Amino acid sequence: MSRKKNKNSLSTFVNTILTIFGENPFKPMNYKQIAKIMSVRDAAGKDVIYQILVTLFNEGKLIEDRPYRYLLHPDFIHEYGPKPQYITGTVDMKSTGKAYVIPDEEGEDIFIAANNTGKALHGDKVKVAMFPKRKSKKNEGEIIEIIERAKTEFVGIFSLSHGFAFVVPDRQTMPLSIFIPKGKYKSSKDGQKVIVHLTDWPDNAKNPFGAIVKVLGNPGENNVEMQSILAEYDYPLDFPKAVEKEAKSISEKIPSSEIMKRHDFRDVFTVTIDPHDAKDFDDALSLQYLPNGNYEVGVHIADVSHYVQPGSAIDAEAQERGTSVYLVDRTIPMLPEKLCNNVCSLRPDEEKLAFSTVFELNENADIKNVWIGKTVIKSNRRYAYEEVQDMIEGADGDNKRELMILNDLATKLRAKRMKDGCINFHSEEVKFILDENGKPLDTYIKVQKEANMLIEDFMLLANKTIAETIAKPDSKFKDYTFVFRIHDEPNPEKLYNFIQLVSKLGYTMNISSREKLVKSYNTLFDAVDGKGEKNLVETVAIRTMAKAVYSTTNIGHYGLAFSYYTHFTSPIRRYPDLMVHRLIERYLIENQPSVDKEEYEDLCLHASEMEKRAAEM
């Protein structure tokens, strides 16, 4: 009995010592410090503690930080330390193999050393066991569970050796090569670009295993590189057969019964104004002179919702894609070509179905009346921006009087927006001139001119009006679920860094109020226009801003200074616009009850993610 009791007492003694180290994981301690914490004062007791420390060190449970001062080995911290805190989040992997986990809830990012990432990959949803926080040190932890794998297919270079092969991923956030067992090569040749699917990751393997699912071709070839970009972002190049079959069955002919249900604008002057190489015309403007001297301006948007029904194969695919993707040499559309370039596209001299917002405006561009509803239109003419810009600058052209009236009204709408506090981000885009093989020959800067802003101003007006119709406090639909385009205020830390940057360039910013900050932004943009620092200042300024996203919870749009804003005007290339069309029809025309908020919030999150992904391509 006595021996058993002594054995139990010694075991308890050892556990107590390990617990003391566990509760002080970053504090090296010797036997005297342990004895003091345990209130052991006699020499014999201290000697026992000394012997236990030596034994624990020899067993690998303690490590010697400095002579005779010990720390608990990291492998035993979770066993003997405080109960660990667990956090879930998303992995942000670095090329070095270390990572950060961005918590699902508010909080600082969590550092994960390369040897603590386990088998997690970039973008994975994971569970992290937090390490006890050390003073003045960053949050740190260990990934202990992969909740959801973000990506299982990667693009990379196939590298063949004797009897085995690897794929070296293109993506810097994938720091590991993927082992390809014999028999899983497909028809890959050494040095080719391929798509590899992760199949396994054995416990004793440093690298994941995979199988080649598609050979793309030789790196550097234009078509191969474009396919690589799409595959890397999991964006499909082709539509599923079920989608193509469904699109093929859609009739291009509009039944007279459908025309009878709609407001007829076929005899009203209507035009489209787009880039010279555009094929999908999803917006048109109409103009009528009213007897009272005012103008009726119609913003007509392709009625995609008439052709794409919820639950259809086309709708499911469009929802998954979220947006059309614009690469250097091609467009990957959200909808099949028959719809986006033909049936829905508001091409000239063709009867087309539209969803319209029609405004009565006086000569000062004050809104006197608004009508929202389904229409049938027939565009008189398709214009390129360059043609309209030439007329604005003095050239003659067809329908110049009507186009100049539209431009005058747009200019006045713009002035009102600027007065209300809109931030005037100047937009310049680098465009490439390609040869027939997709190789760049030259570049040029695409500058937004008045013709571009003419269209933009009326699209902004339509989007704002649609959102206000649903969400303003006096609307009967104010509590209904809706899709908003929201934009939060600038990040304070990024704003501070931006102010420091521009001050070194000789510019000042006033941040004492929103109004003064906006005025400072606009004054700054005017001041740098035409100067060498223009691109730097505008790029960093945009980065101070929050990213605009879709949400069912409205916070307004900071950059536009709109309390209510949505996307209604591009349903051919943006799925949220199609969602908005359906909601407007459901609420305003059919007088149906609200849809489920949680379901639509999930759709908004997905659309925002796909928009972000498309911008990165």
Where are these regions (language model features)?
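Charge-lined substrate channels and their catalytic hotspots, especially those that engage the 3′ end
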Residues: 2-298, 305-350, 382
